[in-house]
Amino acid sequence: MTVAPPPLLAAASLSFLRQDEPVFGPLDFELHAGQLALVEGDNGSGKTTLLRVLAGLLHVDAGELRWRGEPLRRDECAGEIVFLGHQLGLKGDLSPRENLRIAAGLHGTCEGTNPERALHDVGLAGYEDEPVRRLSAGQKKRAALARLRLVPATLWLLDEPYANLDRQGIALVNRLLEGHVAAGGAALVTSHGAVSFHGGEPRRIRMHA
């Protein structure tokens, strides 16, 4: 009998406090390879905090995280997780091409990467060498999204990825998500309704403080 693989990511009784006040939790969920999950909740319910916890930028106060069925160890899965938040992680004095090379180096994927192709795929052909500080807000978001094309991470953590994007940019994010999930990846996304996903009904994770 074939044994089903464990969830890619699982949370059990996950809780986070700030100054002894609960931000979210206890929270339980599972996310499998090939799944998209929408993180929903009112403002202040901890959606961004959850993604920062999963990215390893914050530590939970209680609960457990498991990665592929084993207790999550950051040193073992860091290269498999990429986080895109409100702060895009771009250096303003560097070009999109240079920023992508740095991102690839941090993920240990410099060799064989193609920043130019990634920038072309997100609509920034012709802006490869423009200092990021000179780009519009939407172009900066596209430059950050290009990391998703460049870094071979299994799990995408995307916090409001549609912000500052026009209709074409929103469609781009949806295409990136569909392609990633179809290839066996997984994604957790916070959004205010711009998701148009054609790869099946997304999972929904409801946040409560």
What residue ranges belong to the model's regions?
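Conserved ABC transporter NBD signature motif
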Residues: 63-79
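Hydrophobic anchor residue at the start of the ABC signature
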Residues: 145, 184
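ABC ATPase C-loop
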Residues: 148-149
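Conserved ABC ATPase "signature" region
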Residues: 101, 112-127
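Conserved ABC ATPase signature
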Residues: 93, 131-138
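Q-loop/switch helix immediately C-terminal to the Walker
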Residues: 87, 92-108, 114
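Helix-to-loop junction immediately C-terminal to a conserved catalytic motif
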Residues: 55
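Catalytic Walker B motif of ABC-type/P-loop ATPase nucleotide-binding domains
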Residues: 156-160
